[in-house]
Amino acid sequence: MAVGKNKRLSKGKKGLKKKVVDPFSRKEWYDIKAPSTFENRNVGKTLVNKSTGLKNASDYLKGRVVEVCLADLQGSEDHSFRKVKLRVDEVQGKNLLTNFHGLDLTTDKYRSMVRKWQTLIEANVTVKTADEYVLRVFAIAFTRRQPNQVKKACYAQSSHIRAIRKVISEILTREVQNSTLAQLTSKLIPEVINKEIENATKDIFPLQNVHIRKVKLLKQPKFDLGALMTLHGEASGEEKGKKVASGFKDEILETV
């Protein structure tokens, strides 16, 4: 019998001895920090590939936008129907310093407010803040029945709607123009603007469920590290490195 290759014997398959690499071993975790305007500054963690060669991890982290429930940032379930967007502007070690990027209502909250027998009034303005941020602010409001009203419906006339929309636009424009982005954020959290709109329009038509439905950031000024550090309460904007004197000489060389 001739001795040779047995074709029936199974050959070893390629790739069986290849070493399996855990994809998470090439990544590292970073902590996301919210601005000091929020009570809970620890937002969470995010993953990114480790810095290798010319690829720097901070380049992939800057500009990343995260969406967080406002209830988690404030520690209160009263804010559970609002979502806040935070944008990563600076990397400090393993901490990511963020800034306000937008605000929105949850879909279930928005749909639960739309009902029969009432009028929905919407308004939006595009305004620049005191620190050169361009924002588009959307507001919604619903009519409610007059005191001692028997009729079920509380529809507003077109003239009422136009007058209310004008008042809402004026209040939004004034509040945004006279505030920095941090000051505006502190007004949006306790819903100060909502109550002001409701009080200003009660003589035209009584309103209910007045909310800032959405805040969208359209344009931002040139990045200022000092302003961001002040916003996070970690350092003042005036702290800078000291300039080395040009006539410096090594003391050891002079004593030899």
UniProtKB/Swiss-Prot annotation:
The keyword Cytoplasm applies. It is found in: Cytoplasm. One of its GO terms (molecular function) is structural constituent of ribosome. InterPro entries: Ribosomal_eS1 (IPR001593), Ribosomal_eS1_CS (IPR018281), Ribosomal_eS1_euk (IPR027500). It comes from the Eukaryota. One of its GO terms (cellular component) is cytosolic small ribosomal subunit. One of its GO terms (biological process) is translation. SMART domains: Ribosomal_S3Ae (SM01397). Keywords: Acetylation, Cytoplasm, Ribonucleoprotein, Ribosomal protein. The modification N-acetylalanine is found at A2. The keyword Repeat does not apply. Belongs to the eukaryotic ribosomal protein eS1 family. Component of the small ribosomal subunit. Mature ribosomes consist of a small (40S) and a large (60S) subunit. The 40S subunit contains about 33 different proteins and 1 molecule of RNA (18S). The 60S subunit contains about 49 different proteins and 3 molecules of RNA (25S, 5.8S and 5S). This is Small ribosomal subunit protein eS1. It comes from Lachancea thermotolerans (strain ATCC 56472 / CBS 6340 / NRRL Y-8284).
